[in-house]
From Swiss-Prot:
Protein family: Belongs to the bacterial ribosomal protein bL31 family. Type A subfamily.
Pfam families named among the record's database cross-references: Ribosomal_L31 (PF01197)
Keyword Oxidoreductase listed: no
Known role: Binds the 23S rRNA.
Protein name, entry field: Large ribosomal subunit protein bL31
Keyword Isomerase carried by entry: no
């Protein structure tokens, strides 16, 4: 492989919503950083049967519904 063409690949810690953590390799951040997930397999509707609502932390869903709410009606 060519030098300096690929991002640094290192170990990080991933923290799920329930507080559990695991280590994996990633290009995210730098060695030893922690990635805190907003939505993970324990809370995502695709894996939980769709009973839970997705948390709208950034207001994106609200803005979308406000702008395009008439589409699904």
């Amino acid at each position: 492989m060519k030098k300096d063409t690929h991002p640094d690949y290192h170990f990080i810690t991933v923290q799920m919503n329930d507080g559990s953590t695991y280590k994996t390799r990633s290009t995210y951040g730098s060695e030893g950083d922690t990635l805190v997930l907003d939505i993970d397999p324990t809370t995502h509707p695709a894996w939980t049967g769709g009973g839970q609502q997705i948390l709208d932390r950034g207001g994106r869903v609200s803005r979308f519904k406000k702008k395009f709410g008439f589409i699904g009606s």
